[in-house]
Structures are given as structure tokens and as C-alpha cells.
Amino acid sequence: MNDPEDEIRRRVAELGQWFHNFDLCGVQTAPSHFLGDYPQVKWQRFAHAIPYDLSGKSVLDVGCNAGFYSIQMKERGAERVVGIDTDEKYLDQARFAAKVNGMEIEFRNLSVYRVAELREHFDLVLFMGVLYHLRHPLLALDLLHEHVVADLFVAQSMLRGSRQTIDVPPDFDFWEEDVFEGKSFPRLYFVEKRFANDPTNWWIPNQACFEAMLRSAGFAILDHPECEVFVCRRARLTGPVDPREELREITR
């Protein structure tokens, strides 16, 4: 009879290179990760900011990769957890990790731009490490707000530049220039070619920009428990024009 640990090790190898490191019955899936025991090391820094008891709650994990955060949510008692990604390799890894952990989690091949197809609003939506991989990050935030976020929204993005924030005035004179030179002004850096040898890294915000994007999409920031992580609540848009109304007109 085959050793269960040997079977897990064989299957982990078959599933290719892992980005999420798990301990699956003693088998590490990404023991040489350049970020260390990732994403466990990051999770430890903001786990306290997520409700410990998710009994009866639904969770959507957007860009779930191998399902680390989906599994953490299930461990906290979430009734329904759905993870979506567009990379079938990662989804296969996620299904295997959930199976080894004895958890029922639904993993689907679905883009963030198609979340309306879920036809469901979730009590908690995770958006971890996705924004900077998207060609259209604000559109993604708008779609999440419109179609799937019922209450809590936890977002994480790689950040570069200044970590300081400023109170941005509601309007600027046409001839104003100096404010845009300030390091703390919201900035979204465009990566034309590659970052960290990854051609899918398109944008890198500074902290002021990430916060502003979240607010612009209709999310009220409740907590900032980790340098890249923001816990938000869905709010009503307060601007003079709801950009989603324009989007609906365009797509009709």
C-alpha cells in the first residue's frame, strides 16, 4: 500500500510550480518561495482583522490562486466559499489542497470582469494580490462593488513609492502643477514591460492611490491592519455621477 505522504508529494509535483506554500500532511508545496512561507507570513499580519467566526457567511476569493485564503475562510466556519481564478493550473492546485484538508470549496475558472455571472452577493469578498495584474483595475473594483460585495471587502495590492497620504482637495485649478509633484499625491505607476520578470504586472499604486481607488469604487476603509491590506465595507457612491451608470449605458 502506498504511503499517503508519498502520494501527496507525487501529486504536488504533478501539479507544477506552486505560488502558495501549504503544509499538506507534512509536504510543503513551495518550500523555496522567494517570499518565505507565503502567504502564511502575510496572513499572520492581518488575520486578526478578519472575523474569527464566519458561521453562516458566504465568502468569495477573487484571484484565489491555490486557495490559501479560501481554506483559511473555511477554517473559520464560512458556510459557503467560492474561489475564482483564470489559471486552470492554480485551480487544480486549489482543489487538491482543499481535498487534502477535507474541505468543500467551490473553485471556478472565472475572470474578475465576469463576476456578474455568479449572480450572488457575498458577505465577505477577498481581493488579494490581483489589482496590479489587471489591465483595467478600476473597472474590476467597480464590477466587484456592483455585483458581488454585500458587506466586507478585503483588498491587498503591492505598493511602491510613498506610504504617506494627503487630504486631496475636491477640485484643482486648471493651472495647478505643484501638488502633482508631491510624493504623497495619489500615483499609479504603469509597467510597460515587466516587473519581477512577470509580464502580467501592469500597475503599481502608491498607498494614497490605492486608498483613493477603493474610495472611488464605493468602499469605505475600516482598517489598515497590514502595510498592503485594507479592510473595507461596501458604501454608497457619493460623487456627482455614478460611473457604473455610464458603464451600463455603454454596455446596453
Identify the meaning behind each predicted range.
Residues 113-115, 122, 126-127, 131, ...:
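S-adenosyl-L-methionine-dependent methyltransferase catalytic module, highlighting the catalytic core
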Residues 1-121, 170, 176-178, 207, ...:
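Conserved N-terminal segment of class I S-adenosyl-L-methionine
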